[in-house]
Amino acid sequence: MSPTTAKTPDVSRRSERSRQAILRASMELVGEVGYPKLTIEAIAARAGVGKQTIYRWWPSKAAVLLDACTDAATGDGHDSGLPDTGDVEADLKTVLRATADEFSDPAFEAPYRALAVAAAADAELAEQFLVRLREPGLQAYTRRLRAGQEAGQIDPDLDLGLAVEILLGPFQQRWLNRSGPLTHEFADSLVELAMRAFAPRP
């Protein structure tokens, strides 16, 4: 390798560093100033890049934040599947408790809420929000409930898509409306109530 080649910057590595800095900045800033006051200029300043760098990769602050949340949800060490210990009720409680903790963490809650609110007024963003952030989780719950059916712990005729909505709907409603704390006790109560409805018929 020549001296010239050795000193040539690795453009792809540098671009990825800039990308990660931008995504981190968007997550941090939305928690500090809120989504309405979040700007591309502020993200660029925090990330140490020019705003044109951001506009080359993303058309809007919502697009930046969507990528940031997607990366956080699918990054290293993230397992999108639900545990299967053989006890579907215990497994659902474990996961919903962890979800309650995550949704109570300001570092996660602020950007995710910002996207949820923005998506309510933007059909294209809503579709991407559903496909990239919600559907993988919903599918994981569906797979775990299907395994519960196969194990005889859940009614074999249960509509699994509807069952997941019944389980998660009250949780999401409480979070979105800030109508109560997302405690482990609340998560357990939801699972217990749902499992009574999901149980095999005598």
Which residues does each PLM region occupy?
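C-terminal peripheral helix-coil segments that are non-catalytic and often amphipathic
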Residues: 1-9, 90, 94, 135, ...
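Basic, helix-initiating cap at the start of DNA-binding domains
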Residues: 1-46, 57, 63
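Base-recognition residues in the alpha-helical recognition helix of bacterial helix-turn-helix
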Residues: 52-59, 67
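Tryptophan-centric aromatic hotspots in well-structured domains and transmembrane helices
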Residues: 57-58, 129, 168, 172-173
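Alpha-helical DNA-contacting segments of helix-turn-helix folds
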Residues: 63-72
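Amphipathic alpha-helical segments used for helix-helix packing
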Residues: 69, 103-128
